Amino acid sequence: MSGKHNSVIAAIGIDIGKNSFHVVGLDGRGAIALRQKWSRGQVETRLANMPACLIGMEACVGAHHLSRRLRLLGHDARLMPAKYVRAYSKGQKNDFRDAEAIVEAVQRPTMKFVATKTGDQLDLQALHRVRERLVSQRTGIINQIRAFLLERGVAVRQGLRVLRAELPGVLATRCDVLAPPMVRIIEDLAGDWRRLDERIEALSGEIETLDAGMPAASG
């Protein structure tokens, strides 16, 4: 059962790990015909030598790339949200049990699958995530500048653009409450803010360019 799979395999579940993959295959009767641990480099080689079948995986890191590769080999690769797979887990959790749950889940007619992303779609997703992180960093810097000013009794009206426009004047004229060390600190933060603005603007342009004419994901 663990190494031999003379029976025709109808469906396979793959539990994706960083370096190893746990694979469980069922025959047409639902009996386990394959139960093996493969290295990352073995996955495509092994599956290239097997008849086309249904293959399920959780939609985790690396799953979209592998799904595309397995589809090129002729397999019907499908991705599922991990939360929907959990309902099919049996017994104590381990990697092979996870693969068993995946192969059970992928055969369910009511399963809600995740569309396999193209390379461009993954690039677009990455750009959005990086931009979101930079926007969050910028917000943190702006809040810190406001907090430092308020601690010294200097209030600036709300709004990113307002603070950007008024900050140079505040630093130049409020030397009565802003000592030189604090002015330098805020000027350094303002420099970080400007650099983040430039990076965010550049990423926004990349996102707009890549998003134009983006093909729909395959299901």
How should these model regions be labeled?
Residues 1-219:
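A detector of single, family-specific signature residues
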